[in-house]
Amino acid sequence: MSSTTFTHLALATLLFSACAEEPEGPVTARAGSLLADPTLDFPETIEELGLFPAVPTLETTPVEAKRYTPVWPLWSNGLEKLRHVRLPEGTVVDTSASDSWEFPTDTLFFKTFTTADPSHPDGQRPVETRVVRILADDVEYASYIWDADGLDGQRSDLKLPVEIEVTEGGETFLHAVPNKLQCRKCHESHPTEVLGFAASQLSGETVATLTDEAVFGSPPSVHAVEHDDPEVREILGYFQGNCVHCHNGSDGPSSSYDLGSEVA
């Protein structure tokens, strides 16, 4: 190989490597996406949400989306979930009312269901992404069903429930995408209509991180589920994550009785 040919190959390799590198520094929401402007109408595709700009990986998200994980997550047939909150610029969550936090108008909550898939870059393939938007006097819901390749997906019309066949842990089952009435039935049974994001659901570490990320004006107190018996604590925690959002003693459509840890 001549020195000229070697030089050309080296330059080509260098250029290819430079193009393949991920951009350095924080990623910001793409202009025109819902994440960039939470007041926009819900888009028709997942790409237009702007939440996952580097698919097929789901780990890269814009700085506007703050990730969080509840201490007691809702059980969904073993599916994992990615949760993000996006506040309008210059706003914070009002946590002065203990476990009935107030969220700024146009706050967005995203929840993405994933199933284990070793062929996917993150080891998890997305199945569905749900979006909740807080309005001044209402709440809006949207759901998006991912394509099989995990690169994009389409918005569901929420008129009828949709079932998606999913294999998780060696078992195949039908994952249910709810209709709008089902969304409302669960969410409207909770005083804030936001599930999994409250003083009883976030750890002190998560609250500290979200405070650093300017989600809270000051770190709120957390209300951990406590009991001397670890097994009882796990049971009460399961109630907290899976039952109390409906069964909390309020006047919501599914609140016929109270399973809060103070009562149960």
Question: Where do the model's predicted regions map?
Answer:
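Bacterial N-terminal signal peptides that target proteins for export
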Residues: 1-9
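C-terminal motif of bacterial Sec signal peptides marking the signal peptidase cleavage site
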Residues: 16-18
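Conserved small-residue
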Residues: 27-97, 103-105, 110-117, 125-166
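Generic detector of short alpha-helix boundary/capping microenvironments
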Residues: 6-7, 73, 94, 171-174
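Sequence context surrounding c-type heme c attachment/ligation sites in exported
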Residues: 20-29, 100, 118-264
